[in-house]
């Protein structure tokens, strides 16, 4: 039987076995999982993409043609 895939915990770098019974994967622990969640909530992480436009209000839009 082959050995399970081992990856690094994205938070602390500890080795983590990539197995279906590891409820924290890809993290090594609940603590590392919550640290990562907090970083997303604090907007320390972002998914790259196009810059969002400023809020546009309906009064700023040209009238629609019927």
UniProtKB/Swiss-Prot annotation:
Interacts with GyrB. This is DNA gyrase inhibitor YacG. SUPFAM superfamilies: Glucocorticoid receptor-like (DNA-binding domain). The keyword Zinc applies. The keyword Zinc applies. GO terms for molecular function: DNA topoisomerase type II (double strand cut, ATP-hydrolyzing) inhibitor activity; zinc ion binding. The gene is yacG. Its cofactor is Zn(2+). Keywords: Metal-binding, Zinc. Zn(2+) binds at residues 9, 12, 28, 32. It comes from Pseudomonas aeruginosa (strain ATCC 15692 / DSM 22644 / CIP 104116 / JCM 14847 / LMG 12228 / 1C / PRS 101 / PAO1). Binds 1 zinc ion. HAMAP family: DNA_gyrase_inhibitor_YacG.
